[in-house]
Amino acid sequence: FACKTANGTAIPIGGGSANVYVNLAPVVNVGQNLVVDLSTQIFCHNDYPETITDYVTLQRGSAYGGVLSNFSGTVKYNGSSYPFPTTSETPRVVYNSRTDKPWPVALYLTPVSSAGGVAIKAGSLIAVLILRQTNNYNSDDFQFVWNIYANNDVVVPTGGCDVSARDVTVTLPDYRGSVPIPLTVYCAKSQNLGYYLSGTHADAGNSIFTNTASFSPAQGVGVQLTRNGTIIPANNTVSLGAVGTSAVSLGLTANYARTGGQVTAGNVQSIIGVTFVYQ
């Protein structure tokens, strides 16, 4: 019995360990978010199918790692779901052919927020999976340890909803101009959702965000966000109503706003956070 990864890294007869680099493309699902489907990444075969039947399980102790180490979820093994990190060994899958067959493992996260996410950098460890191989012929009992690494920078959604982008940069035109902010949200199932803004503000009404430009900043001006013409103060929840699988726009527009005193020419920049909440 031996295994290999999609890029050709092999663990030979007798077991061992290998690193698996996967391109993460997480998907928000109802009740669980797909992190990675490893059936497209790890393949195994039986070297002596005429005389031996190999049995393969996912062993107790498999878990998320790195920035995901504090999260839990489920693992789908051969079509059935089990808690992850694994607290017991899964039922076995039979390997009885020399032809490489996918190892049927997919990892999911349990949502813990509305539309949160965890940023993962390329090269980061995300999980350690322990494949156990036995057979019906002798006392062979080998471990194949797979260290799963991200091959790309990605944000893994940790909520039941997700946004079109985690970072949105818009460029305001000249003073008194405005620009729409292209930000949408969708959910795996319909649920009432709202959001609020956060950031450093320059006025008593908490509605004008401070100009934080470090190079040649303009004076007397900040940035204000509106929705359908209505000013949105920081920390005031805006209701979006029921949000389902079709993306819903937040309807935000960025505008200049006077903070007092004389307006002088220069650069204007503000960083404004958007936090989603279930309602």
Where are these regions (language model features)?
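Mature extracellular/passenger domains of Gram-negative fimbrial/pilin and adhesin proteins
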Residues: 1-279
